[in-house]
Each structure stands twice: as structure tokens, then as C-alpha cells.
């Protein structure tokens, strides 16, 4: 007699991203209480399981939801506000002045817009570092994605705190509010070496240990950052942070562009994870992170979009394409960054960066964080190697279904938890606010 389950999801092709990287033709997934109960051939699943709901995606490819290992979701409101500038000019001359006027309502609005974009392009979980992260998590709670959120901690006031001394209590309070949430988690997020002091970084380390939280930090993003760190602290960013005890297996470092071979060895030895953000690094001309060298040392890399103000999208499919092509031409080696490795970064690697067990793969016992892509799209046919299509052909807009914890959040153009038209009306109002902030900063 068939076993009961909540949902049976069927499709022409399933890319599991399990340890064997199994691909199943004419497959199905049994989902119960938010987790995958079984995955296999359609006939076997339908014969062994009885679903209350059956969703037949037909000529679609089912795969794990993508994981954005580093972003600033609310910066969707600043998309296109300032472009074609070096990182520090972009930050200090344009972004920071506008961010001074942020409110919780604006952060929540921008984060919800970011969630909508991610759901529309197949992302089910993301690691966020920004301001007023309680507001980001309210948007996450509304939209239904998973999120590891870190309040950016600076050596100066932010819209979330007037005194940096209070930032640590703020993070404690955020942790207390969200620690039992099924899809949200907290990280300790010192913004960067150049916006912190040794004392603040040490307190971030201690707070992470106290609360059992991971650390999320921008590091070694540019040569300018390195030069400044040497001038102020007498060391390059990686050894400087290592001396402060920040580099552990619970640490995810965003960017890691300006690294020496010895620093790559040190990061590998410490077991840190790196969030590689190729499109943002290219757009800001920050450089090319030595991703292939890090992978060669056995390091785990996730893939991140960075914020929509420096990318300018949160689309993980286009990020995969850029990642693969960038490293091939950089090394003049077409075997660099193969599709399978890049797909791993966007799924399993991202799951590792978020410290969320079981996401980024489709296998029994794992959370049912699943997306389905339309194989009827002209750019998706004919299909020989699914990983190749996902990295080199898919654009993200083939996404038909996005599911988190067995719950359908997006299906064929419709969001199930919020009204997109209402959201866009509020976003248009926020554009007016942003332009006023720009004029006031001049």
C-alpha cells in the first residue's frame, strides 16, 4: 500500500546534486512535512507514495534551489544609482551617503523586492549582510525564502545604531528574536577591515563564539584595501584577520580577490568558506578572485551576486555563466571552472557557506527546496548535458516553480505570498526617496 505524503512533484528530468550527481529522467519526488521523502523514477515514486497534491511539471528540469552565498538584498532599491566607478569612490561618494537615510520600512521593501527577484530566478536561500537586518528578516518571513542575515557592524554609526558600542547588543537581540524561525538564521557580520578596528573585530569574534553563530565578512576585495590594511595595521588583510582569530570553519569571506599563494594555503588550512562574486568584482574592476586555485586547495566556494547596486542583478544563473567564462579566459584554459564545478558552487557550496544542512541537493531527508525550469524554452533544447545547460544556456527566466520547505512560493509568474503589483507601487515611491537622497548628498 502506498505511503502517504503531502506532495508528489514530477518532471521530465531531475538534477539531484547528490553525492553521485545523479540525473534522473522521467522522475518524481515525494515530499512530506517540508522534506524530501523519496526521489527516483516516476513509476516507482507514484507506485510507492500517495500524494495529497500532485504537481506535474511536464517538460521541465527539476533541481535544487540555488543558494546566493553573499548579497545585500535591500540594495535592489539602489540598482543603477551609481555605476562605472571604483569600489571606494562608489561606496563613499554614492552608496554610503544614500544609506544614511535608510529606514526599516525601506530596508524591508528593498529586501522583499530582492526576494521577488530571487524567487523568479530560482534562488531559494541567501546570505545577507546589510543594515537594519530585522527588516530584512521580516521580508524573508513574508516571502518564504531561507536567509542567513548579518547586521553590518562598523566602527561608526549606521542607520541601525547611533553608537557602534550598541551594535553587539543589537545582534544579540536579533538572535533572540529569530533563533527559532524555521527559515532564518543570524550571523555576526563585521563589514570589512577598512570599516572596523582591531577591537571591534575581536568583539565580533567573541560574540560569534558566545552565541554559536557564523561570521560573515568582506575581505581582500581590492588591492586598495590591502594597501590600506598594511599601512594601518602592518599586515595584509588575511594574516591580519588570522591574528585576530577570525578565520575558522565557521567563517565565510566574501570576495577574496587580492590573495597571495601563501594566503590561499592559510585559508585552506583554517577551513574557511569563500563567497565568490565574479560579476560584482568585474563591474567594479576589483580584480579576479583566484577561485580555481582555492578549489585546487580543497576549499569550499559558494557563489554570490553581491548587491544589486554593484551587479546589477540577483540572478544566480547569469552569475554561474559569468563565473565559468571569466576563469576560462583569465587562465586561457577552457578546462578551468567546468560547468559541474560552478553548479556545485551555486548549490552545495552555497549551502556550506550558509551553514544550512541539506539544502543545495535533492535526496531523501533533505529540505524540499526545489526549482523547476521550462525545458520548452528554445535555449534549453536539445539537452545533452544538464550541467552544461544550467551554466551556459539557462538565463534564470526559465524558472517555472520555486519551492522552499515543500511550499510553492512562485509558480508560472505568480507569487503565492505577496502581490507583485502592490510591491512595485511601493518601489516606485522608494525611487523618489533615493533621488532626493542623492540630491541632498551633493
Swiss-Prot record:
Keyword vocabulary terms for this entry: Hydrolase, Metal-binding, Zinc
Annotated binding of Zn(2+), by residue: 70, 72, 218, 306
Binding residues annotated for substrate, in chain numbering: 99, 191, 221, 306
Cofactor: Zn(2+)
E.C. number(s) listed in UniProt: 3.5.4.28, 3.5.4.31
Molecular function, one GO term: 5'-deoxyadenosine deaminase activity
Record CDD domains: ATZ_TRZ_like
Cofactor, how bound (note): Binds 1 zinc ion per subunit.
Catalytic activity: S-adenosyl-L-homocysteine + H2O + H(+) = S-inosyl-L-homocysteine + NH4(+); S-methyl-5'-thioadenosine + H2O + H(+) = S-methyl-5'-thioinosine + NH4(+)
Enzyme class of the recorded protein, top EC level: hydrolase
InterPro entries, A to Z: Amidohydro-rel, Deaminase_MtaD/DadD, Metal-dep_hydrolase_composite, Metal_Hydrolase, MTA/SAH_deaminase
Pfam families hit by this protein: Amidohydro_1
Keyword Zinc included in the entry's annotation: yes
HAMAP family: MTA_SAH_deamin
Function text: Catalyzes the deamination of 5-methylthioadenosine and S-adenosyl-L-homocysteine into 5-methylthioinosine and S-inosyl-L-homocysteine, respectively. Is also able to deaminate adenosine.
Recorded family membership: Belongs to the metallo-dependent hydrolases superfamily. MTA/SAH deaminase family.
Protein name: 5-methylthioadenosine/S-adenosylhomocysteine deaminase
Organism in which the protein naturally occurs: Nitratidesulfovibrio vulgaris (strain ATCC 29579 / DSM 644 / CCUG 34227 / NCIMB 8303 / VKM B-1760 / Hildenborough) (Desulfovibrio vulgaris)
Amino acid at each position: 500500500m502506498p505511503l502517504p505524503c503531502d506532495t508528489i512533484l514530477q518532471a521530465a528530468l531531475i538534477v539531484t546534486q547528490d553525492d553521485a550527481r545523479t540525473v534522473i529522467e522521467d522522475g518524481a519526488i515525494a515530499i512530506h512535512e517540508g522534506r524530501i521523502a523519496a526521489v527516483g523514477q516516476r513509476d516507482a515514486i507514484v507506485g510507492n507514495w500517495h500524494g495529497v497534491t500532485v504537481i506535474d511539471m511536464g517538460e521541465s528540469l527539476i533541481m535544487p534551489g540555488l543558494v546566493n552565498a553573499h548579497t545585500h538584498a535591500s540594495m535592489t532599491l539602489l540598482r543603477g544609482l551609481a555605476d562605472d566607478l571604483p569600489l571606494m569612490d562608489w561606496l563613499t561618494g554614492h552608496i554610503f551617503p544614500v544609506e544614511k537615510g535608510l529606514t526599516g520600512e525601506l530596508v524591508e521593501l528593498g529586501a522583499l523586492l530582492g526576494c521577488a527577484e530571487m524567487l523568479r530566478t530560482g534562488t531559494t536561500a541567501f546570505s545577507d549582510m546589510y543594515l537594519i537586518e530585522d527588516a530584512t528578516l521580516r521580508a524573508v518571513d513574508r516571502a518564504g525564502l531561507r536567509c542567513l542575515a548579518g547586521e553590518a557592524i562598523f566602527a561608526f554609526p549606521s542607520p541601525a545604531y547611533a553608537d557602534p558600542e550598541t551594535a553587539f547588543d543589537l545582534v544579540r537581540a536579533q538572535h533572540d528574536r529569530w533563533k527559532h524561525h524555521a527559515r532564518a538564521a543570524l550571523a555576526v557580520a563585521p563589514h570589512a577591515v577598512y570599516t572596523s578596528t582591531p577591537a571591534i573585530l575581536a568583539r565580533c569574534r567573541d560574540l560569534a563564539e558566545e552565541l554559536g553563530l557564523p561570521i560573515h565578512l568582506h575581505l581582500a576585495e581590492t588591492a586598495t584595501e590591502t594597501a590600506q590594511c598594511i599601512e594601518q595595521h602592518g599586515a595584509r588583510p588575511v594574516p591580519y584577520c588570522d591574528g585576530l582569530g577570525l578565520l575558522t570553519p565557521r567563517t565565510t569571506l566574501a570576495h577574496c580577490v587580492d590573495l597571495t599563494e601563501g594566503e590561499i594555503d592559510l585559508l585552506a588550512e583554517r577551513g574557511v568558506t569563500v563567497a565568490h562574486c565574479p560579476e560584482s568584482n568585474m563591474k567594479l574592476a576589483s580584480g579576479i578572485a583566484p577561485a580555481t586555485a582555492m578549489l585546487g586547495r580543497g576549499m569550499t566556494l559558494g557563489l554570490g551576486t553581491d548587491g544589486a547596486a554593484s551587479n546589477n542583478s540577483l540572478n544566480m544563473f547569469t552569475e554561474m555563466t559569468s563565473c565559468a567564462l571569466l576563469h576560462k579566459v583569465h587562465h586561457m584554459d577552457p578546462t578551468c571552472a567546468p560547468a559541474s564545478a560552478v553548479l556545485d558552487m551555486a548549490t552545495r557550496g552555497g549551502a556550506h557557506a550558509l551553514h544550512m544542512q541539506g539544502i543545495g541537493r535533492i535526496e531523501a531527508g533533505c529540505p524540499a527546496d526545489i526549482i523547476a525550469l521550462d525545458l520548452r524554452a528554445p535555449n534549453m533544447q536539445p539537452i545533452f548535458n544538464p550541467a552544461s545547460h544550467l551554466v551556459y544556456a539557462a538565463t534564470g527566466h526559465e524558472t517555472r516553480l520555486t519551492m522552499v520547505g515543500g511550499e510553492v512560493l512562485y509558480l508560472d509568474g505568480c507569487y503565492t505570498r505577496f502581490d507583485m503589483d502592490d510591491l512595485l507601487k511601493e518601489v516606485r515611491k522608494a525611487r523618489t526617496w533615493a533621488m532626493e537622497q542623492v540630491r541632498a548628498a551633493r
